[in-house]
Each structure stands twice: as structure tokens, then as C-alpha cells.
């Protein structure tokens, strides 16, 4: 069974590097209000992990999508994990807080990404890495343009400004 998790605060959690990350209020509200979103692409045998199953159903019904879906809360996930159910997790994005939530629900660490995997996600999510590794390839595509410079301090910024006169 695939279990989807909507965690729009993922980028902030990833950048924080904290296991116990509390996102800003806006991120928490977005996660709460749109918790049902993965149900749109989930298959009928999949589940969406939410804080409040009743609220998720109410919001999902507003979409008028006429397809079956399963919402589960953390207690249900803990029960399923304790029974040894085969589960594959698909969060919006993997980060340490998501992994920690799943561990607290008795999901075995062996079925979750390790620190090396999470650190690699953090590395390739950085704008600097993307500017260096993705942009050169993307700008080779017909009708695309782009330029990026990475500045690590004010001195590098001043050098760039003196050469280009704008950002």
C-alpha cells in the first residue's frame, strides 16, 4: 500500500536540518487546509495520511471528484505498522521531520530513507547546486535562456555588480 503525505513545508524543514521542525503558521495552515490533495492522484488501494480524517473527507468532497480514496490518521498508521502491513511512503518531499513522524508511528527505519539519502536531497534542492548542475543543461533546450551566479559573501556580490551593474 502506498501512503501519501502532503507536507508543503518540506523545503523549510529540509533547510532547517532539524529533526523536530515546527513550520511557520502559514505552512501549518497550508498543510491542514490541503491535506486531501494527494487523494487526487492516489489509487483506490492507496491512503493519504492526515491529521483529521473527517476534515480531509469534507475538503475532498468539495472537489466533486468521484473516486474512492482512503484517509488515515497517525493512530491508524501506528496500528498498521504494528501489524507489519507492507507500506510504501510517498511524501510531497522527504525530510527528517517526516521520517521522524513515521518512526514515532512504529514504521521500521529499514523502510525509510537514511541520513545519506536525506542529505543528498538537501544538497540537490539548494539553488546553488541547481544553478551549477541543472541550468547549463536546461539552457541547451531550444528557446530557453538563463544565467545564474552564486554569491557566498558581500565581496563576491560587489564583484558581480561591478561587472554586470545589475542583478
Regions from the PLM with identified roles:
Residues 1-50:
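N-terminal-proximal low-complexity accessory segments that begin disordered
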Residues 27-41, 49-167:
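Conserved N-proximal alpha/beta basic substrate-recognition cap immediately N-terminal to
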